[in-house]
Each structure stands twice: as structure tokens, then as C-alpha cells.
């Protein structure tokens, strides 16, 4: 499972969560991908995934995490987490979304 984080350079909550989100995702056996909306190359690569979930970007949280299989191919979005949260809550919510 890939955890793709969509965030923005000017989002303070996104920056605070960057201190632990990748580590937590990897500890839970996921591949973590961070996509800053200002990073043109990364955004172009994962844009189709974001727009499938949020066609006009309304309702996104900052940050938004999408749990995806086959992100480079015929991807499937399995779940999402959005908005800021502490490390323990992030770990619990992410673990609850992963298949057993």
C-alpha cells in the first residue's frame, strides 16, 4: 500500500506532521510518497490520483493522505486521511485503514 501525502509548502500543520508521518507509514509497512503542490514534477506524476478523489480540490484537508495501490499504473484509492493530527492519532487512524 502506498500512502500519498498531498500538502503545500505554506501549510504549517503539514510541516509539523512531516516530522513523523513518513516514519509511521513505513513502520506500518507502507510506501510513503510526499507530494507538495508546488513541486511541479511530483504533482504532475500524482495529479490524476488527487483529481479522482477531489475533481475540483474542494473538501481536501491539509494535509490529505490517500491510501493507494499501483499509483504508477491503473491505481485504486482505498481510503483517505485528512487534516492535522498528533502522531499517536495518525498511527491509529492509518493502521485502522490498512488491510489486515
Question: Where in the sequence are the language-model features?
Answer:
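Thiol-based oxidoreductase modules, predominantly thioredoxin-like and allied folds used
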Residues: 6-7, 28-48
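Surface-exposed beta-strand edges and their flanking turn/coil or helix-capping segments
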Residues: 18, 29, 47-48, 90-96
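Non-catalytic, surface beta->alpha helical segment in thiol-disulfide oxidoreductase systems
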Residues: 60-100
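Local sequence-structure signature of Cys/Sec-based thiol-disulfide redox active-site neighborhoods
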Residues: 1-30
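A generic structural signal for solvent-exposed, polar alpha-helical segments
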Residues: 12, 26, 38, 68-71, ...
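Chalcogenol-based redox active-site neighborhoods
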Residues: 12-23, 40-45, 49-60, 86
Amino acid at each position: 500500500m502506498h500512502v500519498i501525502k498531498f500538502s503545500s509548502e505554506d501549510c504549517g500543520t503539514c510541516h509539523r506532521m512531516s516530522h513523523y508521518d513518513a516514519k509511521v507509514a513505513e513502520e506500518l509497512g507502507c510506501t510513503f510518497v510526499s507530494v507538495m503542490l508546488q513541486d511541479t514534477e511530483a504533482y504532475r506524476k500524482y495529479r490524476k490520483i488527487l483529481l479522482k478523489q477531489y475533481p475540483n480540490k474542494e473538501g481536501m484537508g491539509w494535509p490529505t493522505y490517500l491510501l493507494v495501490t499501483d499509483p504508477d499504473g491503473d491505481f485504486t484509492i482505498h481510503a483517505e486521511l485528512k487534516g492535522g493530527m498528533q502522531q499517536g492519532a495518525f498511527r491509529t487512524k492509518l493502521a485502522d485503514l490498512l488491510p489486515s
